[in-house]
UniProtKB/Swiss-Prot annotation:
Family: Belongs to the GlpE family.
Molecular function per GO: thiosulfate-cyanide sulfurtransferase activity
Species this protein is from: Aliivibrio fischeri (strain MJ11) (Vibrio fischeri)
Xref: Pfam families: Rhodanese (PF00581)
Lineage start: Bacteria, Pseudomonadati, Pseudomonadota, Gammaproteobacteria, Vibrionales
Protein name per the record: Thiosulfate sulfurtransferase GlpE
Length: 107
């Protein structure tokens, strides 16, 4: 895949639930926002943690990228595609959409 795909918050949650997929959600919001609340088991992706992500997550694993509203995540998703990740999604609506949909959040 040369491009990332878009995914709704509900479909993102379903993909994360499918354990056989071993999908990973990365949250690119600022540290304070991440601490206040994030999707369960989300990986906080920053310039300082990108190497850790690439060491821990196989290129074949689905990666879902979340930001605040679903805009910044698109650039990050394309970056991950360019690094070799084969199945990358930008979560439409971002964390705000996830929260408004009443989906689970942890602190």
């Amino acid at each position: 895949m040369d491009q990332f795909q878009h995914i709704s918050v509900v479909d993102a949650q379903e993909k994360l639930k499918q354990q056989d997929l071993n999908a990973v959600l990365v949250d690119i919001r600022d540290p304070q926002s991440f601490i206040r609340g994030h999707v369960e088991n989300a990986f906080h992706l920053t310039n300082d943690t990108i190497v850790e992500l690439m060491n821990e997550v196989d290129f074949e694993q689905p990666v879902l990228v979340m930001c605040y509203h679903g805009h910044s995540s698109q650039g990050a998703a394309q970056y991950l595609v360019n690094q070799g990740y084969e199945e990358v999604y930008s979560v439409d609506g971002g964390f705000e959409g996830w929260h408004k949909a009443g989906l689970p959040v942890e602190k």
